[in-house]
Regions:
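Bacterial Sec-dependent N-terminal signal peptides
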Residues: 2-3, 18-47, 147, 191, ...
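Membrane-proximal, proline-rich intrinsically disordered regions
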Residues: 26-72, 644, 648-665
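Conserved, well-structured interaction surfaces
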Residues: 46, 50-68, 85-160, 176-214, ...
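Long, intrinsically disordered, low-complexity segments
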Residues: 115, 190, 280-358, 362, ...
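Short coil/turn linking the two alpha-helices of tandem helical-hairpin repeats
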Residues: 154-161, 206-207, 224-236, 531-532
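Flexible, polar/acidic helix-loop-strand segments at domain edges
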Residues: 361-514
Length: 665
């Protein structure tokens, strides 16, 4: 990139934070060795190329697992809105009148700087790797990541520069302050070429745990073909930038390529495959399983496992994996009547247990998704195990655990006793809302020197006959109280002391970037566009049949043996359309950072996200309000970051023309 700002990002992001790896180690994982300084000549050495290769994987930590990046991909969609404690970063992304998207918003920044830094690293490896004695298979990892990064950029911003200062796709070592954006087709030409080379040269099996393979490259190649086909077809006349012609008649050939590439991987999966149940895909004890093809890795190792950040009090910045904080409401504010019957205690306290963790209350799921007509409507909840394995719906007390200091049990609904480990609060389905007794549960409670009548739960939770747990229906989801995304939550192995300060740090779990299951949905989407309904139905039913199987109910924390695969397949519509594909993608990848790309690709963002319902910010808000978003066609591209424009020495007119049209002053 011919810009001062990107050059500075390059210097800080790569040369001072590079990682070398010992390729000859007996270990099957990357041996990371932090280094304090590099200069560009480092890439002329074998050690430099090795360090660059390791840095390609390390760079994933700087946006995957970052809560602000996740916000740009989820808030403002039909999955998430801003929550009660949200700041302007989240309100801007919602497009509902409480903020605005500008070139200075975090929505604009995304991963722009990190991606271009890594692209330049890839260029350096590709230029110098052969002379340093590296095989085509190793260099193919750089080709893969260059395409990977450009694919994110072209989906987010439209056309972006291929010349970073020394010529097209050349390694740049000098500071330049001008830049020219290439067109979308020109960027995709590079993406396709790089991924096709990666498919050809990468091994079938990873050289180390988590490294790139042929089928990983096929996943992104099939998705790039699919996305470009939609761009060519442009069914809703969404503008692109820089302006260029597009031939809709070519779209079908790219849909076919997407289908064929995905099907090739499905038929010859290599070391990958589907886990037996959806729960096993995302449960912490199965991390790095065969369904996960790429991840931004973390571990409990204090020195290297979190990019050097450690696991004490987290500050909410990369390379920490802190994204789950955003989708976690402050469940610790619930109160309960203690064993003594005259004081309040906190029945569910934060701990390093999957489904809980540190609550920041920045992003809340829209209620519509859980109600009739939504992806998680009651008919889906009844047979689809993905519902249980996506959300924390029941909140178990942890009062008797070491450090909780809240007693062996508390009083629950209907005056019933709840022991430590049992459920204190639950979200129930929409139909059950009609049976909830909303009469406040009150008791005489000590308040300093006084004893006064108070509502027990603080949230004025409801009650159901014969149940000890307090409840709200999904019809009562609010910005303050909502189901947590269980899949991405923290988990640690040192659970004997789960109330330690690690609960306030980043998660030591890897962030899943690519899943083998997506092949089926890419193939299904392409088949719909090709008019091959039977093929589309076959692909989605593989995942739906799996979703009907449950061997562990994580909300009840109990082993089960349930198979509703037949019901899931029977519920598949006879005719598969794009809306059903989007529903399935939401059920499979909810809250993981896929959604904005999915809605933009299919040009369904406005249609599916223009209105939503949710309750208010208060503890007792349970009534849904309808909110309207303004999503103009120009917003299908994000703004070029203001820092990029400020760093360029170009005329005001040239800078204005560099910016995407919807965000010009």
């Amino acid at each position: 990139m011919k810009t001062k700002s990107l050059k500075y990002i390059f210097a800080a992001g790569l040369l001072c934070c590079g990682i070398s790896t010992t390729m000859t180690s007996c270990s099957n994982v990357l041996d990371e060795e932090p280094r304090s300084t590099y200069d560009p000549s480092f890439f002329n050495t074998q050690t430099g190329i090795e360090g660059g290769l390791s840095a390609l994987y390390a760079h994933l930590r700087y946006f995957y697992g970052n809560g602000y990046y996740l916000n740009t991909l989820e808030t403002g969609t039909d999955e998430y809105t801003y929550a009660q404690s949200a700041d302007g970063n989240f309100k801007d992304a919602d497009l509902s009148g409480v903020g605005s998207v500008t070139p200075t918003s975090t929505v604009a920044g995304g991963a722009w700087g990190e991606l271009f830094t890594n692209i330049n690293t890839c260029n350096g490896i590709i230029e110098n790797g052969t002379a340093a004695g590296f095989s085509d298979a190793l260099l193919a990892e750089a080709y893969f990541f260059r395409a990977f990064d450009y694919f994110i950029l072209v989906q987010t911003y439209g056309g972006v520069p291929l010349d970073l200062g020394n010529g097209k796709l050349k390694f740049n070592t000098t500071t330049n302050r001008t830049s020219v954006r290439n067109t979308v087709p020109e960027v995709y030409e590079v993406i396709f070429a790089d991924l096709e080379k990666a498919v050809n040269d990468l091994p079938d099996n990873p050289r180390m745990t988590g490294t790139a393979t042929k089928n990983l490259a096929r996943l992104y190649l099939s998705k790039a073909y699919l996305t470009y086909a939609w761009w060519l077809e442009n069914p809703n006349n969404i503008p692109t930038y820089p302006e260029c012609s597009r031939d809709a008649s070519q779209a079908q050939s790219y849909f076919q390529k997407a289908y064929d590439t995905a099907k090739t991987a499905i038929d010859a999966p290599g070391p990958y495959g589907l886990m037996p149940t959806f729960y096993e895909v995302n449960a912490a004890q199965y991390d790095r399983n065969k369904e996960i093809m790429l991840y931004a890795d973390h571990s409990e190792n204090e020195k290297f496992g979190n990019g050097g950040a450690g696991y004490g009090w987290g500050n909410g910045g990369s390379p920490e994996n802190f994204a789950y904080w955003m989708e976690t409401w402050n469940y610790t504010e619930m109160t309960a009547l203690s064993t003594a019957g005259d004081t309040k205690v906190y029945p569910v306290q934060r701990e390093t247990y999957q489904g809980l963790g540190r609550p920041w209350t920045r992003m809340a799921p829209v209620a519509d998704a859980f109600l009739e007509g939504g992806v998680w409507e009651d008919d889906v909840k009844a047979i689809d195990s993905r519902y249980d394995a996506t959300f924390t719906l029941r909140y178990h007390t942890n009062t008797a655990k070491p450090g909780a200091n809240a007693g062996a049990w508390v009083y629950g609904a209907n005056g019933m006793k709840i022991n430590s480990g049992e459920v204190y609060f639950s979200f129930v389905d929409e139909a059950t809302e009609a049976n909830i007794d909303w009469t406040p549960t009150k008791a005489m409670v000590k308040n300093g020197d006084k004893t006064e009548e108070q509502e027990v739960t603080r949230f004025n939770f409801g009650k159901l006959p014969g149940r000890a747990d307090f409840v709200r229906s999904v019809k009562n989801i609010s910005r303050k109280c909502y189901p947590i995304n269980w899949k991405i939550s923290i988990a640690r192995t040192d659970t004997d002391n789960s109330f330690n300060n690690f609960v306030n740090g980043g998660s030591p779990r890897p962030w899943n970037v690519a899943k083998f299951s997506e092949f089926y949905l890419i193939a299904a989407e392409a088949a719909v566009k090709l008019g091959k309904n039977a093929d589309a139905k076959e692909m989605v039913n593989v995942l739906r049949a799996r979703a009907g199987k449950m061997t562990f109910n994580q909300n009840d924390n109990v082993a089960v043996n349930i198979d509703k695969s037949a019901e899931m397949i029977a519920a598949t519509p006879d005719v598969i359309d794009i809306d059903f594909i989007l529903d399935e993608r939401s059920r499979e990848f909810w809250g993981e950072g896929y959604r904005w790309f999915d809605l933009v690709r299919t040009q369904k963002w406005t249609e599916r996200a223009k209105t939503y319902r949710i309750g208010g910010n208060g503890f007792t808000d349970t009534t849904l309000e309808t909110v309207t978003r303004d999503i103009p066609a120009g917003y299908y591209l994000r703004p070029i970051p203001q820092g990029q424009l400020d760093g360029m020495e170009m005329t005001a007119e040239e800078k204005a023309n560099y910016q995407n049209p919807a965000y010009r002053n």
